[in-house]
Structures are given as structure tokens and as C-alpha cells.
């Protein structure tokens, strides 16, 4: 979050996949802005689902390969190192907001059932870009900041998802999930204490 605020011109420009990057001097490597620029201006992405799943687009390192991230998430959940409740509620909240309130031009005012397929494409684009899936696997389940009780984890995921989409829709930084996590982490302890008092 600090690097994004301090150096946005350098932080949010990425080399295209399969670009040869020299070991010592990478200043000559052409970089481009992320696909978040297209989404924030109301456009639709021209990438196939396979390209998005494999991470074949300019994105922060490690956040684009959705299949690898899902495999890592399944491994962590099978080893009991991560709880699914916070991640699933986070992704479900992001998906619902993207489906019912899409950023793409003309879709928000259209009938939901008539334009269900373009809305589902918006959900795909929002979940597979902007480090959303990376955050669901690795950042949401941080044991020291995530709520410890089940209902608290669900509420934690919903709040992080709603604030993330708010930052993505109205903010200037594509990885708004970092700021959403910082915001909700400040009340995660309170959520645990409240749930303990309610069920005690």
C-alpha cells in the first residue's frame, strides 16, 4: 500500500508476459498499464477466459495466474492452514457487487436477466484481475489479522469484499484490496470480542 501511494507511475506498470527481461538493466523493457485501466474506464476486456486463467496479461507478479492461485488455495485449505469462510465470503461479495453493479458502460442500467452473460463476464474480469484472487488465497487468511470465529470470518470477508470493490470502482489504485484489508483489520479484534460476548 505504501509503495502504491508513493510511486504509482512505477508500481502500476508491468511488462507483457513472455517479454525478455535482462538481469542487470531492465530500464529498456517496454511496460504497459494493467487491464484495470480498461475496466475503470467502462470497457470490456478482450482476453479469453483461458488467457485470464493462465495469467497471460500485464499484471503484478504472481497475481495473474488464476489456476496456480487456486491450486495454492486448495493446498492451503487441505492442510488446514487457511479457512475457506473468509475467502469464500470475500469472493462472493466481490462477485455479487460486480454482477449487480457492473462498471462496464450501459450494463448497470440494463435488465439483469437480459444481460446475464455480459454481467458474468464482468464478474470474471473483476475476480481474475487486480490481485483479488491472490488476496483471497494469501492475504485474507492471515491468522493474526483475520477474525478467529466462523461468523466473524464471514463478516470479515464480506466487509473486505465490499470495501475492495468500493476502492476498485471509485479509487485510483487497482489493488484496492490492500487498503480494504488495512481498514477491516482495524476492527477484526472487535468482531471476535463481539461474537464471543453474543454466544457466551
State where each predicted segment sits.
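Alpha-helical transmembrane segments and their membrane-interface exit regions
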Residues: 1-4, 93-98, 133-139, 181-192
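Conserved mixed alpha/beta catalytic, RNA-binding, or beta-rich assembly cores of soluble enzyme
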Residues: 77-114
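Membrane-helix interface "capping/anchor" motifs
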Residues: 77-88, 141-154
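Long hydrophobic alpha-helical segments that form multi-pass transmembrane helix bundles
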Residues: 1-70
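Membrane-interface capping segments at transmembrane-helix boundaries
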Residues: 84, 190-200
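Hydrophobic alpha-helical transmembrane segments in multi-pass integral membrane proteins
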Residues: 100-110, 162-175
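Loop-to-transmembrane alpha-helix initiation sites
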Residues: 124-132, 153, 171-184
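Hydrophobic alpha-helical segments embedded in the membrane of multi-pass proteins
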Residues: 67-70, 87-96, 126-139, 154-162
Amino acid at each position: 500500500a505504501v509503495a502504491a501511494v508513493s510511486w504509482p507511475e512505477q508500481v502500476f506498470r508491468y511488462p507483457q508476459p513472455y517479454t525478455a527481461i535482462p538481469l542487470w538493466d531492465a530500464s529498456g523493457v517496454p511496460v504497459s498499464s494493467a487491464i484495470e485501466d480498461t475496466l475503470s474506464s467502462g470497457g470490456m476486456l478482450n482476453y479469453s477466459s483461458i488467457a485470464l486463467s493462465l495469467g497471460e496479461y500485464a499484471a503484478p507478479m504472481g497475481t495473474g495466474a488464476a489456476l496456480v492461485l487456486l491450486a495454492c488455495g486448495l493446498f492451503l485449505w487441505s492442510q488446514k492452514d487457511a479457512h475457506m469462510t473468509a475467502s469464500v465470503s470475500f469472493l462472493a461479495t466481490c462477485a455479487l457487487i460486480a454482477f449487480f453493479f457492473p462498471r462496464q458502460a450501459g450494463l448497470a442500467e440494463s435488465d439483469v436477466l437480459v444481460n446475464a452473460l455480459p454481467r458474468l463476464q464482468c464478474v470474471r474480469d473483476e475476480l481474475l484481475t487486480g490481485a483479488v484472487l491472490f488476496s483471497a488465497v494469501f492475504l485474507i487468511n492471515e491468522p493474526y489479522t483475520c477474525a478467529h470465529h466462523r461468523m466473524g470470518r464471514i463478516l470479515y470477508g464480506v466487509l473486505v469484499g465490499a470495501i475492495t470493490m468500493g476502492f476498485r470502482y471509485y479509487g485510483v489504485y487497482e489493488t484496492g484490496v490492500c487498503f480494504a484489508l488495512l481498514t477491516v483489520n482495524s476492527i477484526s479484534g472487535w468482531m471476535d470480542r463481539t461474537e464471543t460476548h453474543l454466544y457466551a
